């Protein structure tokens, strides 16, 4: 009797525990998604208490700038009107360091900051040295010539004389370091003397001179602390709500983020918008596919075919015109009116006429398309490679002898890939806090519910089995009683004397 009582108590205890576990599992199924969402919102907003704040402030991801130059093989022939021939040189790789300063939190749920960048050459990652010589178009001479095309002949003749006096030619042979970070040029000194605010270059001219050890402008972005719906969106850049480089309000709009983080909880219908000070415009990337980076699920976003399309192909881009062939963007209005063009490397995704006009170009998707891999739950980039090309429109200009007989052509100068991937301790912390723990909680809720249901069945099964035993005992007891009554009745019948006249028959075996 004691063992049966203990079994009943154990079964009841297990049932009670099962009830608690099942209830906890059910509550978790209802509450965990909300808890995870709140934790994500808490940790991705721009707030000193958030997990991602230090990541936002001092980007721990190693970024690399890989630069490829187009070495002009036949400069003299180009001056005679022949087709340009180029050879790709590089990559010349630089480690890019970024840090934010002057961080100021404002009362309207925004934060203002300056982000400084610096670059260090990485010989072990490069295919060549900064001392390598490259033949490129003389950007100052050829761009100034195109800009002066419609000016009076007298001015063009004066310019020809000035170029000759300063020893300026249509093509220059300079080292990688000089092209990147600047070289002394007498024309720059002359311009700075008489037109001091015309160029940002002080004494030296270099394609990346203005980027090294400098900031990309004063960004003011929404923190998401008070209003999650606007998290990371740019409110102003250099105090402006829109720029004035282009010819339409839509093209002048500052849309999206500053290009480092995006709103969490993305779907395949989401897009990535960001403002690029270097391109002087907002850009929009579209969803392509799901993927996995180091065990972390990602969404890959790529450039649409319309990113650099001209106005005739994609009317919303009409504001970026005057346009040439589709696939290149005229950035002259934000680059001192120099005839510079932005595009994908090797004129990938552009009108084939552009690549066919220059020998040595081989556009392909694998090498020349850009992408960003984003963790969709947090909106944080895991892996990215942004690739862009800078080209110069050159042509013969009547009255300027240095331009010779150059046929009109958009000649590539260089292309670069700005790449970075999360790694090391940062990757491990991110994976543990924002991927592994939510995954553990997700599975734990169903395990608890299933285990609770199993334990709940124990007292039920015990009760059923106990009732069966009682029924069997009662049935066997009742049957035994009937048998005893039958035997007793039979015995009494044998002991009773037979009535007179009854003949007893002999029992035979």
UniProtKB/Swiss-Prot annotation:
Glycosylation sites: 102, 108, 173, 212, 255, 310, 330, 383
Quaternary data: The C-terminal region binds to PDZK1.
One GO MF term attached to the UniProt entry: high-density lipoprotein particle receptor activity
Organism the protein comes from: Sus scrofa (Pig)
Family assignment from sequence similarity: Belongs to the CD36 family.
Cysteine-cysteine disulfides: 251-384
Topology in the lipid bilayer: Multi-pass membrane protein
Gene responsible for this protein: SCARB1
Lineage: Eukaryota, Metazoa, Chordata, Craniata, Vertebrata
Swiss-Prot/TrEMBL keywords: Cell membrane, Disulfide bond, Glycoprotein, Membrane, Receptor, Transmembrane, Transmembrane helix
Protein name: Scavenger receptor class B member 1
Segments on the Extracellular face: 33-439
Record's comment on post-translational modification: N-glycosylated. The six cysteines of the extracellular domain are all involved in intramolecular disulfide bonds.
